[in-house]
C-alpha cells in the first residue's frame, strides 16, 4: 500500500496502482467503523466525472457495507452537493470520490465524518491494521438533494438585472447542476464543456491555471457576455473572467465578497497564506477580523468553524461562505452570489476591482520535487535560508514578509511540488523578492530546476 495516498486534506493517488480494490475496501471499512462508533449506520457517497469512479465506488461501498453501514448514493455530483447532503440529509457523514484537479489518471476521497472534514492521515494507521474485508450483502440506495439545493440557491441569489454569463465546467462534475442553477436565478446562460467526461477532452479542469481559460475567454468575448465562471473538476473551486477576457485573481474575488458580507454582518474572515497582503487590510477596514491559516480546504473549514467566521477563501479558488450558508467550499453557490452582487451594481467587474490597491504579484507557481522529500526540503530551506530585514511566518512552509513585498515557499499536500507565490508594491519589489527566493533555492538545492509550472 502506498502510504503517500493518505494526505493532510484527503486521500489521493493513482486510481489503478494506489486505489486498487483491496485498498479502497479497507478504507471503506475503516470509515464505516468510524460511523458505527458514533452510533450511526448511514453515509452519503458521490463521485465526479473521472473514468475510474465506478470501480472505486463499487469497492468503497463493499467496505462500508462490511462495517454495517448503508450507503446513500448521490451519483455523479460536484463535491459541494455531497457536503450539502451531509448538512440537510438523514446523516452527517459523506465520502466524495474525486481527484479534484490532479491528472486524469488519479482519483481520491474527500471525507466528512460527523459533520467534520476528515483527513487521510487521520485514518491511515487504522487502514494499515486491516488484514482483509469480509464482503457483506449490499446496502445501497439512490438519493438526491438537487431540487432542495436549487430552491435554496434561487432564494438567496436571484439576479436583480439580466446578465449574460458563460460557464465552463471543464467536463467535470459541475456542468449540469451549474447550468440549472444559473437558469433558476434568471441568468442568460451560455454553457461550454458542460457534459461530464473524465477524459477532459477540451482542457484540464483547473481554473487556477491560465492555460485552461483560453476557451472561456474566447467565448465570453465572442458572445459579448458580462463575465464568466470556470469550475474545477469537482466543483469546489471557481475562477472569474471579465467581459474583456481578463482573469480576476482569487484575492480580488475574496475582497468583493468581504465588502459585501462585512456590510451585512461583522466577524472574522479566514484566508490562506498564499493570499495578498492587501486582503487583511481590507478585512480590517470593513470591520472584520483577518485570520491567516494554513492552505487547504480541510484547514480553512476547521478554522471557519472554530472562529464562527463570516467567510473564508483560498488563493487557489476555494471560497467558503458561512453567513446564511454552510461554510463549505461551493463554486456554484459562490458564482451565483457573485453574480447577484454584480447584478446589484451599476459598474463592471473591472471597475469594482479597480477600487482595490494595485499590487504586482505572481500566480501560484509550482516546482517539481520528490513527493517523499518535499516536506524535509522545506525544513532544510527554513534552516539554511538567508533573508535580510525580514519577518518570518512559519504557519505553513515559510512566508517572508518585507516592507513592500512578500514571498512564500511551501510543500503541496496534494502533489509532488513546491508551491511559491510572490507579491510586491511595485514591479521592482516583486522582482526583488522573487530573485531573493531563487538565490536561496539555488544555493540550498543546486540541482533543483527552477522551471515553474
State each model region's role.
Residues 71-80, 247-250, 271-272, 293:
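Active-site nucleophile and cofactor-binding loops and adjacent substrate-binding regions
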Amino acid at each position: 500500500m502506498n502510504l503517500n495516498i493518505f494526505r493532510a486534506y484527503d486521500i489521493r493517488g493513482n486510481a489503478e496502482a494506489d486505489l486498487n480494490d483491496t485498498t479502497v475496501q479497507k478504507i471503506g471499512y475503516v470509515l464505516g467503523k468510524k460511523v458505527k462508533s458514533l452510533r450511526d449506520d448511514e453515509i452519503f457517497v458521490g463521485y465526479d466525472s473521472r473514468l475510474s469512479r465506478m470501480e472505486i465506488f463499487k469497492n468503497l461501498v463493499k467496505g462500508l457495507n462490511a462495517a454495517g453501514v448503508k450507503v446513500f448514493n448521490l451519483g455523479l455530483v460536484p463535491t459541494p452537493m455531497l457536503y450539502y447532503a451531509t448538512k440537510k440529509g438523514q446523516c452527517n457523514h459523506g465520502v466524495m470520490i474525486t481527484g479534484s484537479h490532479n491528472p486524469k489518471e488519479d482519483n481520491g476521497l474527500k471525507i466528512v465524518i460527523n459533520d467534520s472534514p476528515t483527513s487521510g492521515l487521520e485514518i491511515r494507521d487504522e487502514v494499515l491494521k486491516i488484514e482483509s474485508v469480509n464482503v457483506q450483502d449490499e446496502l445501497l440506495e439512490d438519493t438526491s438533494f438537487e431540487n432542495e439545493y436549487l430552491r435554496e440557491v434561487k432564494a438567496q441569489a436571484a439576479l436583480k438585472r439580466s446578465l449574460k454569463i458563460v460557464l465552463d465546467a471543464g467536463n467535470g462534475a459541475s456542468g449540469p447542476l451549474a447550468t440549472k442553477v444559473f437558469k433558476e436565478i434568471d441568468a442568460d446562460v451560455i454553457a461550454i464543456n458542460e457534459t461530464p467526461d473524465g477524459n477532459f477532452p477540451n482542457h484540464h479542469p483547473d481554473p487556477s491555471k491560465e492555460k485552461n481559460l483560453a476557451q472561456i475567454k474566447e467565448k465570453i468575448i465572442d458572445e459579448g457576455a458580462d463575465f464568466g465562471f470556470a469550475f474545477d473538476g469537482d466543483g469546489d473551486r471557481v475562477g472569474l473572467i471579465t467581459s474583456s477576457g481578463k482573469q480576476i485573481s482569487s484575492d480580488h474575488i475574496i475582497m468583493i465578497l468581504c465588502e459585501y458580507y462585512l456590510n451585512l454582518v461583522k466577524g472574522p474572515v479566514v484566508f490562506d497564506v498564499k493570499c495578498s497582503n492587501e486582503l487583511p487590510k481590507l478585512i480590517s477596514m470593513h470591520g472584520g477580523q483577518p485570520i491567516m491559516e494554513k492552505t487547504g480546504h480541510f484547514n480553512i473549514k476547521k478554522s471557519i468553524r472554530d472562529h464562527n467566521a463570516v467567510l473564508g477563501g483560498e488563493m487557489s479558488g476555494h471560497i467558503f461562505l458561512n453567513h446564511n450558508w454552510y461554510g463549505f467550499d461551493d463554486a456554484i453557490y459562490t458564482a451565483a452570489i457573485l453574480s447577484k452582487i454584480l447584478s446589484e451594481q451599476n459598474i463592471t467587474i473591472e471597475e469594482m476591482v479597480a477600487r482595490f490597491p494595485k499590487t504586482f504579484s505572481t500566480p501560484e507557481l509550482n516546482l517539481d520535487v520528490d513527493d517523499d522529500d518535499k516536506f524535509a526540503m522545506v525544513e532544510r530551506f527554513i534552516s539554511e535560508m538567508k533573508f535580510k530585514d525580514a519577518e518570518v511566518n512559519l504557519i505553513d512552509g515559510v512566508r517572508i514578509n518585507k516592507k513592500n513585498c512578500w514571498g512564500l515557499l511551501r510543500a503541496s499536500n496534494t502533489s509532488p511540488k513546491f508551491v511559491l507565490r510572490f507579491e510586491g508594491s511595485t514591479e521592482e519589489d516583486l522582482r526583488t523578492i522573487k530573485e531573493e527566493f531563487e538565490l536561496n533555492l539555488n544555493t540550498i538545492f543546486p540541482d533543483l530546476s527552477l522551471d515553474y509550472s
